[in-house]
Curated annotation (Swiss-Prot):
Lineage start: Eukaryota, Metazoa, Chordata, Craniata, Vertebrata
Active site: 121
InterPro entries per UniProt: Iodothyronine_deiodinase, Iodothyronine_deiodinase_AS, Iodothyronine_deiodinase_I/III, Thioredoxin-like_sf
Organism: Felis catus
Topological domain ranges for the Cytoplasmic compartment: 34-244
Extracellular domain ranges by topology: 1-12
Keyword ATP-binding: no
Role according to the record: Plays a crucial role in the metabolism of thyroid hormones (TH) and has specific roles in TH activation and inactivation by deiodination. Catalyzes the deiodination of L-thyroxine (T4) to 3,5,3'-triiodothyronine (T3) and 3',5'-diiodothyronine (3',5'-T2) to 3'-monoiodothyronine (3'-T1) via outer-ring deiodination (ORD). Catalyzes the deiodination of T4 to 3,3',5'-triiodothyronine (rT3), T3 to 3,3'-diiodothyronine (3,3'-T2), 3,5-diiodothyronine (3,5-T2) to 3-monoiodothyronine (3-T1) and 3,3'-T2 to 3-T1 via inner-ring deiodination (IRD). Catalyzes the deiodination of rT3 to 3,3'-T2 via ORD.
Name the UniProt record assigns to this protein: Type I iodothyronine deiodinase
Group of enzyme by EC: oxidoreductase
MF-aspect GO terms: thyroxine 5'-deiodinase activity; thyroxine 5-deiodinase activity
Consequence of changing residue 60 to F: Loss of 3,3',5'-triiodo-L-thyronine deiodination activity
Coiled-coil blocks: none
A UniProt-annotated Pfam family: T4_deiodinase
Amino acid sequence: MGLSQLGLWLRRLWVLFQVALQVAVGKVFLILFPSRVKQHIVAMNRKNPHFSYDNWAPTLYSVQYFWFVLKVRWQRLEDRTEPGGLAPNCPVVRLSGQRCSIWDFMKGNRPLVLNFGSCTUPSFLFKFDQFKRLIEDFCSIADFLIIYIEEAHASDGWAFKNNVNIRNHRNLQDRLQAACLLLDRSPRCPVVVDTMKNQSSRLYAALPERLYVLQAGRILYKGKPGPWNYHPEEVRAVLEKLHS
């Protein structure tokens, strides 16, 4: 094992400790101060009011919550993106099954907006119309690409009530079928899926959802990770500035 791999595993162990401590403390607070915890959760939910507190709050600090948060935190250790830096040219798959890469969708100096997400992530779907309006308003100066990644809240994982019912993808065909559900929403831009190695999700630290703007192979804008910090309006501001 090389030094870089050893360092990665040491960081993973540290993250494991942090997440385990967070879950343990969260459970204790739920028992000792249930009303105060609920107040805090309700305040967080105001950022995404379309999804009811009762649909997701009871799942906080569950075993499924622990494993999902750990996976997200571990993936973020592999983040290879920074504003101004070179954008990772990860392999992706078109809905037809054809393999390609992210850079294949860049056209000269036109900005390319990347939208990472999945159907089981409520904020991704609730803000889908906002994203479509971006395409309508800026298609003359920018290109757009949706990259469907692993499910945020699969029915056999950290599942929410009254959510889209999709299991974790066991193979590429499962992922392609899940991504095809987005076609019912008329996305108005190409839709591709991440490979089963989740390379784009890892290198762009995209789970559960995230927005980027690329230009000439570099990262012009790096949105914060969802669900609470997934903001299509920030992309609008970037594109308006470019267009002015």
